Amino acid sequence: MGQKSNPIGLRLKIINTWDSLWYANKDYTTKLHEDFLLRKFIKKAFYHASISKVVIARKVDVIMVNVYSAKPGVIIGKKGADIDKVKQKIVKMINNNIELNIIEVKKPELKAILIAENIAQQLERRVSFRRAMKRSVQSCLKIGAKGIKVSCAGRLGGAEIARTEWYKEGSVPLHTFRANIDYGFSEAKTIYGIIGVKVWVYLGETKSSNE
C-alpha cells in the first residue's frame, strides 16, 4: 500500500495537514474549484519563484493565501509592485477580497516538489538524466535528509522505447506512518515527449499529530 499511495495523502491527520483550511456546505465544489484555479494561477505567474506549496484559508469576507517560496523576492518584486499586480488579478478572477502572504522556505533542497521541478528543468535543458538525479540526491543528503528516492519515466535520453530509471540513497520507509516523507511530482516537456519526475524525501520519524 505504501508503495502505490501518495505519501502525503496517506499521512493526512497522522503527521500531515490539508493545504485547504476551510469548511463549506452547499457551495463546496465552487470553493474547491476556486482553490484549484488560485494554485494554478500562482504557480504559473511565479514559475521561477520555486513555490513549494500554497495554503488557502477562508474567513467570511476574505481569503487568506500563504505562498511558501524559496525565492520570495521574485514574487514580491521591487517595492512590492509585482505582488500588488497579482492581487488585483486574483480579486478580478474570484471576485473576493484576498490576503496574500509570502513565506520563505529555509531549506529548498529538502522539499520534494522543488527537487522534482529542478530535475525537470534540467532535463528540458538537455542535461543527462543520471547527472541531474545524482546531483539533486547528493545535495539533499548533504543538507540533512535521511534518505531520498528519485524516479524518471519516459523517453530518457531520446530512446525509442520509454522506460523508468530510479536512483536511491539512504532509507525511505514508505510503509511507516510516523516517517516524515515529503513527495513531489513534476513533468519535463522535452523534444522527445514528456518525462515524469517523482521524488520521495525521508526527513526522519516524527510524532503523530494526535499524540
Curated annotation (Swiss-Prot):
Annotated KH type-2 domain ranges read 38-106
The UniProt keyword set, sorted, is: Ribonucleoprotein, Ribosomal protein, RNA-binding, rRNA-binding
Q: Which SUPFAM superfamilies match?
A: Prokaryotic type KH domain (KH-domain type II), Ribosomal protein S3 C-terminal domain
Q: Which GO terms describe its molecular function?
A: mRNA binding; rRNA binding; structural constituent of ribosome
Q: CDD domains per the record?
A: KH-II_30S_S3 (cd02412)
- Which SMART domains does the record associate with it? KH (SM00322)
Q: Which GO terms describe its biological process?
A: translation
The cysteines covalently paired via disulfide bonds are none
Output a single Gene Ontology CC term carried by this record. cytosolic small ribosomal subunit
Gene3D superfamilies in the record: 3.30.300.20, Ribosomal protein S3, C-terminal domain
Q: What InterPro entries does the record tag this protein with?
A: KH_dom, KH_dom-like_a/b, KH_dom_type_2, KH_sf_prok-type, Ribosomal_S3_C_sf, Ribosomal_uS3_bac-typ, Ribosomal_uS3_C, Ribosomal_uS3_CS
| Domain of life according to the entry | Bacteria
Question: Briefly, what is this protein's role?
Answer: Binds the lower part of the 30S subunit head. Binds mRNA in the 70S ribosome, positioning it for translation.
Which HAMAP family does its entry note?
Ribosomal_uS3_B
The family line of this record is: Belongs to the universal ribosomal protein uS3 family.
Q: Which NCBIfam families match?
A: rpsC_bact
Tell me, how does this one assemble?
A: Part of the 30S ribosomal subunit. Forms a tight complex with proteins S10 and S14.
Q: What is this protein called?
A: Small ribosomal subunit protein uS3
**What organism, scientifically named, is this protein from?**
Ehrlichia ruminantium (strain Gardel)
